Amino acid sequence: MSEVKNRVCLVVIDGWGISNESKGNAILNAKTPVMDELCALNSHPIEAHGLHVGLPEGLMGNSEVGHLNIGAGRVVYQDIVRINLAVKNKTLVENKHLKEAAERAIKGNGRIHLCGLVSDGGVHSHIDHLFALITALKQLKVPQLYIHFFGDGRDTSPTSGVGFLQQLIDFVNKEQYGEIATIVGRYYAMDRDKRWERIRVCYDALIAGVGEKTTIDKAIDVIKGRYAKDETDEFLKPIILSDKGRTKDGDTLIFFDYRADRMREITECMGMERYKDLKSDIKHPKDMQVIGMTQYKAEFTFPALFPPESHKNVLAEWLSVKGLTQFHCAETEKYAHVTFFFNGGVEKQFENEERCLVPSPKVATYDLEPAMSSAGVADKMIEQLNRKAHAFIMCNFAPPDMVGHTGVYEAAVKAVEATDIAIGRIYEACKKNDYVLMVTADHGNAEKMIAPDGGKHTAHTCNLVPFTCSSLKFKFMDKLPDREMALCDVAPTVLKVLGLPLPSEMTGKPVVIEV
C-alpha cells in the first residue's frame, strides 16, 4: 500500500458557476462565507464546458460529463466531438475500421454502401460526416460506392430535403465518385419503437428496390411532387435511383448516424438475424458486413468506426491499484455521478472503495425543499473524516443545480446557502482531522436564474467554476502553458496533493505547486 503525504477531501458542487452579473445570480447574492473564504484563500477558476470537457464547442457542461472529466483526469471526448475532430483533421482515412471495410470491399466484390440521415440537423447525423466518408473511401480506392439517403424533416424543415439532396448530388459530381441509390424517409428507416412494418419498407427498398423508380436527374422533381401531396422528408416512401445500388451478397454497409437509438432496428435487420421479424418475402443477402458510426448497442456483433473508449486508471481505479481506501457520497439525485460517472463510466466498484447513498427528499419539486439532503451528506462525510480511515473521500452537493433547474430564484439562494453551510461543517472536520479540502463544481447553473428576456433561466451555463485548495503548502499556478485549466486537471491535482504519481493515461495536469 502506498503512503500518502496528505489526505484529501474533494467536494463537487453541482451547478455552481462564477459570474459577476448580479441580476438573478443566486450564488453572488447568497450568503456564502465559507466558499468566499476558500476562494479568497487559495483558488483558481477552471473551465467546465465545450471542448474543455469533450463536448462540442460552446456547449454548456452537464453533470455526467463534468464528473466523468473530474474523475478521469483527462478530457473525455464525446462521440460527436471525436467524429468532428476526425472530419476537421481529415483523419477518417486512417480510421482502422474504415480501412478494414475498404480492404474487405477491394478483396471482395468492390462494393460499399453509405446509409444514414442526410441533413445538417446535427441530432442524429451530419451531412459533413457523409461528405468526409465519401472522400475517405475515394482515397482508399473502393471501386463502387452507393449512397442511401434517409430524409430528415424532423430536426430540419420538413421540405429541406431537396436542398440536402442537391448538395449531395453536387458533391458526388465534383468528386466524380459515388452513386445515390435510394431515397427514403426516416419514418421508415429510423423507427425505434419496434414498428417492424415501417422498417420493412426501408429494408425491401435497400435490398430489392421496392419503391418508385426514377433517375437521379429527376429525383428532385419527384420529391417536390411528393411535397405537393403533403408527403414531407420524414415520410418519403422509397425512391429507387439505381438497380446496381441494391445491397447484395458480400456487400459492406456503413451507417453514418452517430446517435444510436434510431439506428438499432435497421442495422439489426441488415446485419444480424432480426430481419426474420420483418416477415419480408425478400431474400436476405449472404455475407453482408454492417458497420456503425458509433456502437449502437453493446450486444451487436458488428464493429463501429468510433467504438466506445474505455478509461483506464481513472482516479478511483488508480487509488485502488495503489492499495488506498476511498469513500464516495451523494444524495439520490447525484449518486450515479459520484459512482458510475466519476469512476469512468463503469458500474464497477473498485477494491477498497466505499459508497454511501443519502436519500433525496420526496417532494414534487426541489424549490419546496431547497436544502435537499445537503445536511445528511455532510453528516456522512464528517463521520468518515472523524474515522480518518480513508486517504481520499469525496461527495457531491446537489442543491444549486437541482433547485437552479426549477427557475425559482429565492429557492436557489436558499439552496446555495445550505450548500455553503454543509461545506463549512466539512471544512471544520477537515481541519480537525488533518485533511486537505478541495472544492470544485461540475458546471454552472445557479449563478444565472434570470434569462435575458426577464423570464426564468433553468439551464446550465458555460461559466467557469471554482477550484479551491485549503492547504497553503500548495499554491495554484497562474496558468498552464498550452491551454486553459479545466475539470480534467482536478484528479491530477488531487494526486499531487496526495503525493502520488500520475498514471500515464491521465493527460490532465496538476495545477498546484508545492511551496
Swiss-Prot record:
KW Isomerase (keyword) present: yes
Catalytic function, reaction form: (2R)-2-phosphoglycerate = (2R)-3-phosphoglycerate
pH dependence, record text: Optimum pH is 7.5-8.5.
Gene3D superfamilies cross-referenced by the UniProt entry: Alkaline Phosphatase, subunit A, BPG-independent phosphoglycerate mutase, domain B
Source species, domain of life: Eukaryota
GO CC aspect terms: cytoplasm
Residue positions binding Mn(2+) 2: 14, 63, 442-443
Enzyme kind, highest EC tier: isomerase
Activity regulation info: Activity is not affected by 2,3-bisphosphoglycerate.
Active site per UniProt: 63
GO MF terms held by the record: manganese ion binding; phosphoglycerate mutase activity
Single GO BP term: glycolytic process
Protein name as catalogued: 2,3-bisphosphoglycerate-independent phosphoglycerate mutase
Taxonomic lineage from the root: Eukaryota, Metazoa, Ecdysozoa, Nematoda, Chromadorea
